[in-house]
Amino acid sequence: ADNRFGLKYWAGAKEPHTGQYFDSLEGKATSFSKRELETILTDSGLTDYQFYYPYPERWFPMSIYSDQWLPKKGELNQNLRNFEGERMVLFDEEQVYDELIKDGRFPEFSNTYLMIAGPERKDCPVYVKYSNDRAERFMIRTDILGDAAHRQVRKVPVSAEAVSHVKELKHWEEVLDVQYREAGLRANRCELKDGAAYFEFLHGRTFE
């Protein structure tokens, strides 16, 4: 569902249902805010639900966040992937997102929502990252699973060509483990299961 208070509509994107600027902000469209969607769910008798936050939008999300895994400062930097036609750029959305994240208000201004209603499912990821801007043989989806005490990483091929790439991750774990053993380093443990590669979840500093 589109969020009528999504940040891109403040920043100059057109309302997708009317094709006009600021319609959702002025109450002239059929989209809803997070609070309005929560009211619709509870009024329908659905008291168990989860919100997810596709980014940057719902058509071709690059990431999907959740209340258990919200974005960090500097992550929301792909804000001009607009599919509703022409738009204006009234301010730097990345900087505003960083301020919203710091203030704990990102969920209110997410451009769109994905809702799952019903008893909480333990198999749902808390975070999803799509790597589709690669050659097809390397296109994968990375999921972070589990609660804060039992995190796990799952890598899934999103194209037929990428199946072999995911299978090779186990091979390279073994190769690297041997190569760096004398240096006291070990590769992140990998397990192949149901067509996916599962890894330990490790905290560290990225060198990207």
Placement of each model-derived feature along the sequence:
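Short alpha-helix
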Residues: 27-53
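ATP-binding glycine-rich loop module of kinase domains
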Residues: 125-174, 200
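Short hydrophobic/aromatic beta-strand or adjacent loop that forms the aromatic wall/cage
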Residues: 109-115, 136-141, 194-196
